[in-house]
Amino acid sequence: MGAPGAAEARERIRRGEHAGPTAGLAPGYAQANLVILPEEHALDFLRFCVRNPKPCPLLEVTDTGSPVPRTLAPGADLRTDVPRYRVYERGKLVEEPADILPRWRGDLVCFLLGCSFTFERALLAAGLRLAHVEQGRNVPMYVTNRRCAPSGPFAGPLVVSMRPYRPEEVPRAVSVSARYPAMHGAPVHVGRPEALGIKDLGRPDFGDAVILGEGEIPVFWACGVTPQAVALQAGLPLVITHSPGHMFVTDRRDAEYEV
């Protein structure tokens, strides 16, 4: 049996048949990061995304009170179609549920942001390995010392994901990922994690540590977990996001986002 399409993948998630990370799920379909917050903070967050397009490439904003992403997946329900969510109350992580039906309110607005899984498939097609996939782990993510451009209550550090490559592979990784600006685009830094304030690659803030192969160096991309780091600092009464690595599968094809 072939890989499930986007709608089938979401149905499996909704039924609880797929509860883990979504890397490799529904190949060829773009996946998205999710941030949900009250309408009173939506304009500030929209400005935050516009001011920080590398970590927060905006794909869609839903109508207030609607869990349906009409552009990316008109038959979906953002309350149930992500394998795992994170619920923050006043900056504290309070819950990681499999659905957010009990949490849903009529004033909530959903933001869907580009995800690096799209350019990861392009990296594989270009003959570049993905260490975290080979090692059966979620991609490692790190909070950096770079600050995002603030908007209202939203201010905080840039979060990056890391994939290791040999120095001669880096130009290819840069050129391939740069073709997907709506999915974080080209790397923000190559080598020297200490330049980003990262003290230990073996202790990521999100995801899992990966083993670097001989001669490999770390390559860092802006990451859609950045809004979670920002949510911790914003201290809003309620912010809901996807759990790292547990994305929303859209009906849009990866190829639609290549430039």
Swiss-Prot record:
Keyword tags: Lyase
E.C. number(s) listed in UniProt: 4.2.1.-
Span list, region Disordered: 1-24
Recorded superkingdom: Bacteria
Cited Pfam families: D-Glu_cyclase (PF07286)
Ranges of Basic and acidic residues composition bias in the record: 8-18
GO molecular function: lyase activity
SUPFAM superfamilies, per the entry: PSTPO5379-like (SSF160920)
Stated family: Belongs to the D-glutamate cyclase family.
UniProt name for this protein: Putative hydro-lyase Rxyl_2409
Origin species: Rubrobacter xylanophilus (strain DSM 9941 / JCM 11954 / NBRC 16129 / PRD-1)
